[in-house]
Amino acid sequence: MKIIMSPAKEMAIDLPVPKDWVLTQDSQKIVSILKSYSKEELQKLLKVSDTLLEENWDKIQKFQESVTYHAMDLYHGLAFRSFKQVANWEEHRDYAVKHIRILSALYGAISPEECVKPYRLDLTMSLKIEGETLKRYWKERIVTSFEKEECIVNLASSEFSSLFNKKQYDWVDVDFFEKKEGVLKQHSTISKKARGKMAAWMMSHDVQNKSELQKFNVDGFAFDASLSRENHYCFVKGI
């Protein structure tokens, strides 16, 4: 079983891991191209302000320095902050390393303990690597790191989950709804929080198959059998 998560633009650099560090060949190709960009080209690619341009330019130029971060500690978006509210991944390191994969436009499919550096890049950006878009470049590279027919619990955004042919796996999409006066609604913020908490709950409860996932009951969410299908689990919270 694998749990896939999207990365986050927001990052925390308060838990550095000083160590020798080598980029994979796939990631090095991307960094080399980014280093070749002028500031004007980089700003156009990243679509950032002058302040953020300087910050990201500096990150790229210093990419070979030895200070890195564990992926789960570095990413600090809403899903990851919610994850950390439920459980500490280092206390469940074996499960986290075996089952959780964060999908990155720079690093590919990485485990929570993999050492990475801060960056700003997503699959929708117009960067070309060997004539390929970022999405096409990573599609085969990411997918081949998963076994065919294994269970994949999708807690990632459509940007990353669309890399996969879902029919080749025991795939489970997960959606979260709030129900008020009989009406179901989805909210991006609530869904992001719930994805992070579900990943942490699965880790802390040593979930090994998708049927166990139906027991998830954090923050008032409960499995709704009437809305769910074999490959699509829906969780509803009454408000």
What kind of region is each of these model predictions?
Residues Q85-E230, C234, G238-I239:
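Internal, well-folded beta-alpha domain core
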Residues K2-I110, E114-L121:
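Near-N-terminal "mature-domain entry" segment
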